[in-house]
């Protein structure tokens, strides 16, 4: 069964600190007598919705989206950790949690349950973030790890913005771990086995990151609303 793990982009898409907006306006409409429906999409910031941060987002000479080959975005070893969080604090993983992760992991998913607040102000102005030290712990133990994703709006906690800059540089620095923010994890749980995952980024020339579509192939019998 295949599932979308990325949200639909619309004008209600939350943004970090509620500082940006996506607007979608019709450009031409068949109802007006023209030959096709077209729209204008205006992103006031490319980092909104389910999106990817590349090293160039925080590192001047860092890699950009186009520096990655297609196979880099295809993952066969995915692992999900459930760590329920209800406040905008910094997150790290215990020794036991880190030891539970398979040694060959390529894409690590952290489900906090914070996605339940996505329609509330709390989601964008009291969000958790990741401790910078976690990047070093993961990189040291899991040499095949290429991406980390989670169900809150940014790697940077709104309450710990200075530390968030350190965290971004820690994850996106040497031997970078791509950061996938604002994933739709409403319908995935630790019991689900991931067979594969495809990360499809919007490929732009000056790619410091941007919206992504994520499709996961899961070994599970039930069906949910985001099934492909």
Region spans (language model):
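Active-/binding-site microenvironments in catalytic and ligand-binding cores
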Residues: 1-228
């Amino acid at each position: 069964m295949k599932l979308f793990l990325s949200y639909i982009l619309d004008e209600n898409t939350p943004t970090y600190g509620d500082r940006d907006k996506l607007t979608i306006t019709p450009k031409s409409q068949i109802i007006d007598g023209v030959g096709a429906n077209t729209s204008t999409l205006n992103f006031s910031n490319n980092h909104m919705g389910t999106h990817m941060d590349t090293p160039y987002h925080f590192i001047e000479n860092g890699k950009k989206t186009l520096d990655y080959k297609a196979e880099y975005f295809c993952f066969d070893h995915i692992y999900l950790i459930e760590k329920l969080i209800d406040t905008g604090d910094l997150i790290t993983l215990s020794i036991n949690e880190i030891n539970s992760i398979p040694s060959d992991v390529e894409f690590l998913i952290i489900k906090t349950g914070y996605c339940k607040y996505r329609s509330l102000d709390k989601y964008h102005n009291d969000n958790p973030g990741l401790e910078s030290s976690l990047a070093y712990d993961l990189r040291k133990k899991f040499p095949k790890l290429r991406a980390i994703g989670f169900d809150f709006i940014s790697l940077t906690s709104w309450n710990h913005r200075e530390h968030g800059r350190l965290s971004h540089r820690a994850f996106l620095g040497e031997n970078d771990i791509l950061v996938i923010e604002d994933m739709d994890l409403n319908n995935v749980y630790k019991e689900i086995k991931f067979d594969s995952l495809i990360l499809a980024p919007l490929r732009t020339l000056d790619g410091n990151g941007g919206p992504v579509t994520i499709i996961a192939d899961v070994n599970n019998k039930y069906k949910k609303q985001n099934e492909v």
